[in-house]
A protein has these predicted regions:
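A surface/extracellular/periplasmic glyco- and lipid-processing/surface-interacting theme
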Residues: 1-18, 23-286
């Protein structure tokens, strides 16, 4: 999600987007797509970080990546359905998830490594080669608690301008009351989809605070995706400060108010910002 990699292609189609910090104080994005049929360009696709695998597992999703940090190799080889652009990792060896070089392609409109893409057809073919199921596991019962078709959720406190506090792209969301959605901005401008030119917009935004710490001198991060903590849930120009918890590392995060009731969010698209639990004071809510 650095400046040279934007705008991304196909991100508008994602039902859920996760944004989390990586080394160098930049962020990377992971889109969760329930319906990706017909998508001819998705990306750019970059390398895996371990915590993104945990977030993907919350949705019983196939995890797609091009390469990985060495710290992610073990989890990728631990019965995780993943599709990778690389077949091995120096210092680790063979990796599962490689379905051939035809799964991804590069364009000439921007320099490497920001020019690697895939498509729905390529991913479907890869799942066939790797014998992955495209159906939900029989025990998966969904992630969020959504409002019913005839319901609209609002909270007590107003939140029409919100910032997660990331240092490099300095993103924010502004609420559009006429449409009932939050519009996304970063690098001082509207964030758009490369294919449509449309600005990204979301029915729900979640700031999820996690313990984060460096793994080495290169700044590779560990993000605790299981311990739980504070979260802020935004919808319809309002917000609730709450607590998030998980039953185990692969189960969905659940959000609860101060009375212990699970938070209900509105139907539609959701953007999740993973924030350092030590940087809560950098969050802006207006």
């Amino acid at each position: 999600n650095i400046y040279g990699a934007i705008p991304q292609a196909g991100i508008e189609r994602a039902d859920v987007v996760y944004e989390a910090p990586v080394e160098g104080a930049i962020t990377r994005l992971m889109g969760i797509f329930e319906d990706y049929d017909g998508m001819e360009k998705i990306g750019s696709v970059r390398s895996c970080r371990e915590y993104y695998v945990h977030f993907a597992k919350e949705f019983d999703a196939l995890y797609v990546h091009y390469g990985q940090a060495v710290y992610a190799c073990e989890i990728l080889n631990s019965n995780i359905d993943n599709i990778s652009g690389l077949s091995s990792q120096e210092g680790f060896g063979q990796l599962y998830g490689y379905a051939g070089e035809e799964t991804f392609y590069r364009t000439d409109d921007r320099p490497s490594p920001h020019n690697c893409y895939t498509s729905a057809d390529r991913l479907i073919e890869a799942t066939k080669k790797l014998c992955y199921s495209r159906e939900y596991d029989k025990d998966y019962d969904g992630h969020y608690q959504f409002a019913g078709d005839d319901q609209t959720v609002t909270f007590t406190d107003p939140a029409t301008h919100i910032e997660p506090g990331y240092e490099v792209n300095e993103p924010w969301f502004d609420y559009n009351a006429d449409e009932g959605v939050y519009y996304r901005y970063q690098y001082g401008d509207a964030q758009i989809d490369q294919l449509t030119g449309d600005q990204l917009k979301y029915d729900n935004v979640i700031f999820q605070l996690c313990e984060c710490y460096p793994l080495d001198d290169h700044g590779y991060l560990a993000i605790e995706a299981e311990k739980g903590g504070t979260a802020y849930v935004f919808t319809k120009g309002t917000y609730e400060k709450c607590t998030w918890t998980k039953d185990d590392i692969e189960s969905p995060a659940r959000y609860f108010d101060e009375d212990g009731n699970e938070i209900t969010i509105n139907q539609g698209k959701t953007w999740v910002c993973v924030v350092y639990d030590t940087k809560e004071d950098q969050i802006v809510i207006e």
